[in-house]
Swiss-Prot record:
Its main location: cytoplasm. This is Thymidine kinase. It comes from Bacillus cytotoxicus (strain DSM 22905 / CIP 110041 / 391-98 / NVH 391-98). Pfam families: TK (PF00265). It is found in: Cytoplasm. ATP binds at residues 15-22, 88-91. One of its GO terms (cellular component) is cytosol.
Length: 194
């Protein structure tokens, strides 16, 4: 998978909630550390579910991270001696994240991003589709549908144990109290045309 002769490329890890995106990002970062490469991890300030300064997977794996408010703030922390730049919850970053990732890869960094490819309505989420289009590698993970057990590619938002309506706010940071993985057929969004 990583037989590139030139330094600098983009990897996207995407999928529904509970599919293991953060876990996979952490795994890749740890592998770079075993290889004696310098890595730095970023997360959006909005993601404070489990920790302010760590990327934490739903199963408890974690790695230190720098929380940033804006995409271009990433440049303040990147130094020439680094090899790998990892960014979790990339869907929460502003539209500049695509340009930032491109610049970093063009400067020779291996850039690994992880995020939701669809919002709770089943529509493309934030800048993730653009990042998938420019990436050298895309890994799409699936969870297990909480209703029928099939592979889950969607994230169901629940409000009082009922599916959220199509016109509810797109961003609501949460975990299992607000979301569960669903397959195409068990995913429900009231007032959305099928």
């Amino acid at each position: 998978m990583y037989l590139i002769n030139q330094n600098g490329w983009i990897e996207v890890i995407c999928g529904s909630m509970f599919s293991g995106k953060s876990e996979e990002l952490i795994r890749r970062v740890r592998r770079t550390q075993f290889a004696k490469q310098n890595a730095i991890v970023f997360k959006p300030c909005i993601d404070n579910r489990y920790s302010e300064e760590d990327v934490v997977s739903h199963n408890g794996m974690k790695v230190k991270a720098v929380p940033v408010s804006a995409s271009k703030d990433i440049f303040k922390y990147v130094t020439e001696d680094m090899n790998v730049i990892a960014i979790d919850e990339v869907q929460f970053f502003d539209e500049d994240i695509v340009e930032v990732v491109q610049i970093l890869a063009n400067r020779g960094y291996r850039v690994i991003v992880a995020g939701l490819d669809q919002d709770f309505r089943g529509l493309p989420f934030g800048q993730v589709p653009q990042l998938m289009a420019i990436a050298e590698y895309v890994t799409k993970l699936q969870a297990v549908c909480s209703v029928c057990g099939s592979p889950a590619s969607r994230t169901q938002r629940l409000i009082n144990d009922e599916p959220a309506a199509f016109d509810d706010p797109i961003i609501l940071v949460g975990a299992s109290e607000s979301y569960e993985p669903r397959c195409r057929h068990c995913h429900a969004v009231p007032t959305k045309q099928r």
